[in-house]
Amino acid sequence: MLFMAGPAASWSLRPLGLHGVPQALCAVLLTVLVMKTLVLGDTKLEDLHPQSLPLNKYLNCYRCLLETEELGCLLGSDTCLTPLGSSCVTLHIKNSSGFNVMVSDCYSKEQMVHCSYTRASPVFGFWIFYQCCFLDFCNNPDNRKNSMH
């Protein structure tokens, strides 16, 4: 039997509406796959050093790789820059039992085809809903309810 000490000992997946270990593992796998795609997807060399870019030509977005409404950002809270004409995005990963996690990031013009789009995820029983917006920090938790519909 495995025992955990510290804060991890009191963590439980029950409040998130998960009803079994397989479902929890699928949810974690799906979240990791989405985060990998967002982080490593279409990274270009000039995107790696945004400090040297003129800010008036770029949209500032909120970035969080794992977030829940109840707990806020759990992994990777940051900002990102994307050229004007692109968008900020929040992906909602949901299932029918009420599980809902979010991933927020910048989207390039080429990725904007997914805006306001719902699709099935690679993990059975989950789906992904994309929401895009076009103002500075419109996808952060405080602005999301007003700027994303």
Swiss-Prot record:
Family annotation (CDD domains): TFP_LU_ECD_Ly6G5c (cd23545)
Glycosylation sites: 95
Tissues expressing the protein: Detected in adult brain.
Keyword Transcription regulation: no
Stored InterPro entries: LY6_UPA_recep-like, LY6G5C
Disulfide bonds: 61-88, 64-73, 80-106, 115-132, 133-138
Official protein name in the record: Lymphocyte antigen 6 complex locus protein G5c
GO molecular function: identical protein binding
Entry superkingdom: Eukaryota
Domain UPAR/Ly6 intervals: 59-149
Pfam families: UPAR_LY6
Protein localization: Secreted
Gene this chain is encoded by: Ly6g5c
Post-translation changes: N-glycosylated.
GO cellular component assignments: external side of plasma membrane; extracellular region; protein-containing complex
Keywords: Disulfide bond, Glycoprotein, Secreted, Signal
Record carries keyword Repeat: no
Signal peptide interval: 1-41
Main location: secreted
Oligomeric form and interacting partners: Forms oligomers.
Described purpose of this protein according to its UniProt entry: May have a role in hematopoietic cell differentiation.
